[in-house]
Amino acid sequence: MERSTTSDTASEKPNPSHSTGAVQMRIKNANSHHDRLSQSKSMILSDNVKVLEPINRHRRNHSQHNLTLADIISTPDHTVVEKEGYLLKAKIADGGKKLRKNWSTSWIVLTSRKMEFYKESKQPALANLKPGYKPECVDLCGAHIEWTPEKSSRKNVFQITTVSGNEFLLQSDIDFLILDWFHAIKNAIDRLPKERSCTSRNLEFKLRRSSSTELLNSLDTESKESKPEHRKSLIFRLNYSASDSNDRSRVKSRLKKFISRRPSLKTLQEKGLIKDQIFGSHLHLVCEHENSTVPQFVRQCIKAVERRGLEVDGIYRVSGNLATIQKLRFVVNQEEKLNLDDSQWEDIHVVTGALKMFFRELPEPLFPYCFFEQFVEAIKIQDNATRIKAVKTLVKKLPRPNYDTMKVLFEHLKKIAAKESVNLMSTQSLGIVFGPTLLRPEKETGNMAVHMLYQNQIVELMLSEYSKIFGSEED
């Protein structure tokens, strides 16, 4: 091996004594400090040849490192990097246990099966040079990705939930950048198999969460070359359960009889044992059930906010405690007597959060899917008077529950905007909060950023021109 004394570049020449199947490795260090942390490697290996000798390489600090072929092959991930870059990240759950949200900037590397989080862009290169270095990793097999504007006051936030119960929020203020990341991760998830391996890992997670770990611990023990008696015990349990087919068939037949004797859903509903939920039901069904055109829960929330929340800083923008919001959701779904002035709902952000959740969970949004493109075309009209008239015409065509609920809601939001000097919530701010919640396309396309802009503008226009849009025909 030769080393130049005038350059930072070190090269290795293959040993002539090696066979043609030997590994040739060249490690080149660049002049800059940043590039020295990220080294490029090239390797040539002919087929059917075992390499037993380690490959020596010299670094500028003259320290010796031995790198065998096994070390190279056992590197955790040699898949192609599909995308990498900086995003804001917050881990909000670990194994199903909720964590405090803490945003930090991370260098994210996306491959075909997983994502890795690093503190900076240099670390992926350092990870390959430091044995045992493990970045925070997200297995995408069986994972779920969705936009979650309710989880943060920041814009452009989406959440990744893994089968192991980990939850991550990712965010960027740059619209096209976050959209690219969302679609890249979603495509990676969609390409992965959703059977067997993912299902088994999901089952293992559920077993661990329910403390049913006897069999799992036994399997772990076996994989770690446990004592022979432990292996025999595990084999005995597995064989015993496999040979007990008669008992299982009897249990199965009893379950079939039990299920066949269960009353139908209609019978349970007629007896009042099962009731339609308020959250997640179609708007017209909720109104039919209550014999009204505006859901009672919507009216209650609006009255509570107007009593004690009109002057609260960031009303509707600031998120309330999610656990308390879910508790309020449960009370409403059980049709229990609701008093929003009760001390447990004293945080007005819990009330506003529940109201936003109600509209967000409607199977069809307040602006029905079939009207979405028509509203978008109307907001594109340049002339303001013509634009207002087009929007008013569309609003008048809405189903009665949608129109009446929309009128009540926007009248309320107009009162919020009137207190802008105190609560700092302008019509534009309210448009950003409620735009994606109240209207959205039935199927998301690549124009998500453009749609989001139109959604905000439509809500903003309807607030600023409320009297003209919801007024009489002569207005």
Swiss-Prot record:
Disulfide bonds: none annotated. Keywords: Cytoplasm, GTPase activation, Membrane. It comes from the Eukaryota. Residues 281-470 form the Rho-GAP domain. Residues 80-190 form the PH domain. GTPase activator for the Rho-type GTPases by converting them to an inactive GDP-bound state. The record marks R317 as: Arginine finger. It is a peripheral membrane protein. It is found in: Cytoplasm; Membrane. This is Rho GTPase-activating protein 15. SMART domains: PH, RhoGAP. It comes from Gallus gallus. Residues 1-22 are annotated as: Disordered. GO terms for cellular component: cytoplasm; plasma membrane. GO terms for biological process: small GTPase-mediated signal transduction.
